[in-house]
Amino acid sequence: MYAVASIPFTDLGQVKKLIIKSAAAGADFVELRLDYWTRKETPPFLEMIELARNYGLDVIVTVRDPEEGGVWSPPWRGEAYEMASEAGAVCDVEVKKFKELPCDRAILSVHYFRKPPREGEVRKLSQRALEAGAWAFKVATVVTDFPSYFLLFSESVHPRTAFMPMGEGTEALRLASALLGSFLNYGSVGEATAPGQVSVRQLTKALSALGGRGD
């Protein structure tokens, strides 16, 4: 199980500060949310990958589709994933839309902002991710209580499944994800990138208490 610091990629100076802050908070990964970069030119994120690695952090590159919570659909999305792949980073793409895995280590993800997935949907999508050879499968969903959340979690057939409950008042469920064995656990070091997101420091404390860092 790993702690991931999700960083909106806006201003380079701010991104640098948040990477350093993520390392100090005990994160294992930083997620660079490139869809926050609202310029037409490709963001200069390769130097940020190098900086993160200098601080002992692995890197996830995400250009989230607007239909699943992204800021916008940039013209350089494909190019950014190619660059991330060449740099050896993890790439996060939507399981419902991908045609081929953009990186050797790819996360196939799905997001439900209005209501939880139908029964069996997580099983179907996780099976697709597994058969595609995805490094991990991620589900972010609105949820109201622990029993329904546990049922959704238990549907996944992918051995590396990350679950993120979303919505107001789900902070405790976020921390409980580690108890269920969520492979990746996302937190913030500044601006939250998802509703209900807790801080990375809270996550690392929870994971350390469980003695469950790593695979």
UniProtKB/Swiss-Prot annotation:
It catalyses: 3-dehydroquinate = 3-dehydroshikimate + H2O. SUPFAM superfamilies: Aldolase. Pfam families: DHquinase_I (PF01487). Pathway: Metabolic intermediate biosynthesis; chorismate biosynthesis; chorismate from D-erythrose 4-phosphate and phosphoenolpyruvate: step 3/7. Its EC number is 4.2.1.10. InterPro entries: Aldolase_TIM, DHquinase_I, Type-I_3-dehydroquinase. Keywords: Amino-acid biosynthesis, Aromatic amino acid biosynthesis, Lyase, Schiff base. 3-dehydroquinate binds at residues 6, 31-33, 64, 174, 193, 197. One of its GO terms (biological process) is chorismate biosynthetic process. The keyword Signal does not apply. The active site is at residues 111, 138. The keyword Amino-acid biosynthesis applies. GO terms for molecular function: 3-dehydroquinate dehydratase activity. Involved in the third step of the chorismate pathway, which leads to the biosynthesis of aromatic amino acids. Catalyzes the cis-dehydration of 3-dehydroquinate (DHQ) and introduces the first double bond of the aromatic ring to yield 3-dehydroshikimate. Belongs to the type-I 3-dehydroquinase family. Homodimer. This is 3-dehydroquinate dehydratase. It comes from Ignicoccus hospitalis (strain KIN4/I / DSM 18386 / JCM 14125). The gene is aroD.
